[in-house]
């Protein structure tokens, strides 16, 4: 077991009840184009077309063969584009249950499938896009082989669902998914679970189970990869979440695209925080109807630390997100707030009284309590960064755009979510995720 000592479990109110409850009916689903780093779509449908679940909606021009498929059957009601015609979302009004049929396999035959057969089924069904590379967090190139594949079977994000019961309820499909993944690599398939996890005993020796304990980010793929299979420009690994592993298993066992997801609804503004079963890409306007407290709220697809604001063309469940978080828009001004004790405010430093209430849950809002200012190195980053890097120096180089120094300090191992806590504790209010993405893009372009 690998024990993480540095990090932070954000004490936010609205922790979801870890029981699956009925969810409001969803009438629309969508694929969000901006979730896929560097993707340029070649559209295969237009508004008004009727599509089946699993039918191709668009293909990546940069990586021919990588297809993005419909998560439900129905009619394409909108194709939203932003500046410079960037694809924002392809929206489908759900109608019927028509689905594209794929090849089915017996469970005991999966371990003998040729790599090309597995790859072609994943590409044709759109499940290939569940995989992401490290470094760069992009969809893998067809035909490439990773040094290892990581399946994340734990989640330490604030307000997240507990993965173990969900996996155990679909254990046969999960094991089948792991077997399929072993056909894509000559290395290990690492299943990362929390301390005391009940997963284990896969018949293939290529699958190994690892345990991590400690505060967030102990449950992030970047943390697991750093300790088990560090990457470089010449070494690439892939990763995916546990529900995508289940979906891959069901694809090969049942011959149909599996798009059900169990997600957590949580946050201070959710009236009944709980787990719900919904559809990949579900409309969050439909899903949250009657679920929120009155007032101006911000809906976030994903974690409050690293998720995406869900509004307008983006008001749908993200491809890689297993939770929806809702907090209040912090527009109120507080007179002389900086001199008040701050009983209702949490701080990682001893600047507010709330720092000393270890069991208290706080009603966070979107208020950042100030704007950008100088980056002050007072040790905050070191408190929340468990990886073997120098965070203050790395973050400075990211802001300066120094690709050589950032690469030497380990930025290739990171994704935006790995720096989310650094953004949260930063006295200067800087957003380090976009700075990291800019540097990674330049490193990739310059080779």
Swiss-Prot record:
Protein name, UniProt field: Na(+)-translocating NADH-quinone reductase subunit A
Gene: nqrA
Family affiliation: Belongs to the NqrA family.
Reactions performed catalytically: a ubiquinone + n Na(+)(in) + NADH + H(+) = a ubiquinol + n Na(+)(out) + NAD(+)
UniProt entry tagged with the keyword Repeat: no
Metal-binding is among the record's keywords: no
InterPro entries: NqrA, NQRA_2nd, NqrA_C_domain, NQRA_N
Subunit structure and binding partners: Composed of six subunits; NqrA, NqrB, NqrC, NqrD, NqrE and NqrF.
The species this protein was found in: Klebsiella pneumoniae subsp. pneumoniae (strain ATCC 700721 / MGH 78578)
Keywords: Ion transport, NAD, Sodium, Sodium transport, Translocase, Transport, Ubiquinone
């Amino acid at each position: 077991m690998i024990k993480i000592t540095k990090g932070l479990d954000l004490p936010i109110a609205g922790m979801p009840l870890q029981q699956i409850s009925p969810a409001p009916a969803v009438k629309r689903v969508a694929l969000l184009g901006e979730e896929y780093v560097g993707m340029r779509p070649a559209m295969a449908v237009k508004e008004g077309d009727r599509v089946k679940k699993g039918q191709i909606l668009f293909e990546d021009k940069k990586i021919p063969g990588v297809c993005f498929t419909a998560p439900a059957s129905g009619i394409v009601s909108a194709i939203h584009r932003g500046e410079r015609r960037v694809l924002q979302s392809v929206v489908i009004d759900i109608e019927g249950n028509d689905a594209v049929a794929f090849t089915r396999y017996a469970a005991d035959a999966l371990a003998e499938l040729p790599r090309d057969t597995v790859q072609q089924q994943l590409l044709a069904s759109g499940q290939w896009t569940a995989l992401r590379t490290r470094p760069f967090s992009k969809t893998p190139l067809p035909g490439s082989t990773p040094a290892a594949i990581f399946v994340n079977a734990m989640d330490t994000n604030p307000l997240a669902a507990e993965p173990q019961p969900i996996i155990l309820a679909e254990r046969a499909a999960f094991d089948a998914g792991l077997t399929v993944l072993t056909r894509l690599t000559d290395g290990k398939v690492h299943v990362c679970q929390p301390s005391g996890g009940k997963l284990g005993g896969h018949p293939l020796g290529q699958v190994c189970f690892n345990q991590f304990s400690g505060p967030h980010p102990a449950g992030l793929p970047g943390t697991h990869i750093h300790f088990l299979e560090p990457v470089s420009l010449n070494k690439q690994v892939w990763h995916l979440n546990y529900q995508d592993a289940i979906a891959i298993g069901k694809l090969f066992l049942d011959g149909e695209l599996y798009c059900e997801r169990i997600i957590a609804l949580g946050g201070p503004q959710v009236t009944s925080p709980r787990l719900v079963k919904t559809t990949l890409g579900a409309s969050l306007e439909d899903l949250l109807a009657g679920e929120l407290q009155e007032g101006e709220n911000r809906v976030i697809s994903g974690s409050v630390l690293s998720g995406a604001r869900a509004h307008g063309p983006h008001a749908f469940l993200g491809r890689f997100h297993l939770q929806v978080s809702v907090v209040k828009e912090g527009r109120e001004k507080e007179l002389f707030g900086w001199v008040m004790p701050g009983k209702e405010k949490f701080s990682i430093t001893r600047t507010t009284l709330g720092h000393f209430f270890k069991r208290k849950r706080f009603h966070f809002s979107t208020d950042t309590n100030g704007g950008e200012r100088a980056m002050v190195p007072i040790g905050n980053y070191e408190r929340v960064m468990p990886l073997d890097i120098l965070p203050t120096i790395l973050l400075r180089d990211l802001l300066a755009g120094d690709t050589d120094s950032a690469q030497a300090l380990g930025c290739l191992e990171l994704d935006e979510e790995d720096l989310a806590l650094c953004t949260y504790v930063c006295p200067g209010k800087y957003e380090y995720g976009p700075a990291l993405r800019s540097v990674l893009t330049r490193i990739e372009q310059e080779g």
